Amino acid sequence: MSKEKQLVIRPENELDLKEVYKAKNGRMKESFYEQELQKLHIELCKLQNWVKKYDKKIAILFEGRDAAGKGGTIKALKEHLNPRGCRTVALPKPSDVERTEWYFKRYISTLPSGGEIVFYDRSWYNRAGVERVMGFCSQEQYKEFITQVANLEHMLIASGTMIFKYFLDVGKDEQKRRILRRKTDPLRMWKLSSIDDKSLSLWNEYTEAFEKMFARTHTHFCPWILVNTNDKKRARLNIARDLLSKIDYEEKDQTRVCLLPDPHIVWQYSEYQHHNDDPTQEILRQFKEHKKAEKSQKKKDKKLQAKEQKESKKELAKSGKDSKQKELKVAKESKANQESKAKDS
């Protein structure tokens, strides 16, 4: 994995705010998002070619709150990948037989083979999140999981599997808005589950469970990467950047595309305490500051214009006065000349 430091100037930082974000809600514009995502898709295809060529194994775990955008992110990342070399794992609840077996058994068979990338739409960390909060596992089962998971991940990494763990976080109000939308949008109703409504009322319980999960399972060899997904488009671009920046594959465009992610969107759990703000609100604040600056500049320009007009009028008045005096002088001299000629004659 690349540890080289980069001086990062992202495309969104080079353009005018209005070209990248919507002034009404601070979220990324579709046009800019699609333009940047296309560049990242090309790099993801290069990554997949490298994975296939060298029989690499990559497992990408997506955990997070309900309606945080896990499925949509996976769909965006794998849109142009060869389906023969990548797949998505989204297991249903355990069967009666699976409940009697070692918890990790049903996940072992889903792990990537050589030359394969596997995306997990929720993973074995279900036990530390939804299963624990909703009471779907006992305290003994939870303790067994939490003491074994780091060792399992260490063994997988030692055997050549690259693991990336992303936790997608979303604000309480935004989560509520998305869940309500699922209830009314026929094209999104399939996403609605029986526990979605309960997750809204159990916000604090989930927060506590996730904090304990991070504290026990965030390791130097397999860290948790947290992502603010209040703006889904911004989140997806920066997840792709983060993933690509951590793998040294062939023909990588590290100077223009594979940049380090925006630290306001993506960060390691160890830096979690510094990221409590909604990035969309920061964009709205910048729009407000720009609007204020534009208004102030217009006011200054108006004053300057009025001053210039006043000075111009004074100049014109002075010029007119000088012209009149000159005309009087010429007339006086002409009269004097005429009188002199008359006298001589």
Range-by-range predicted roles:
Residues 1-345:
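Glycine-rich phosphate-binding loop of ATP-dependent small-molecule kinases
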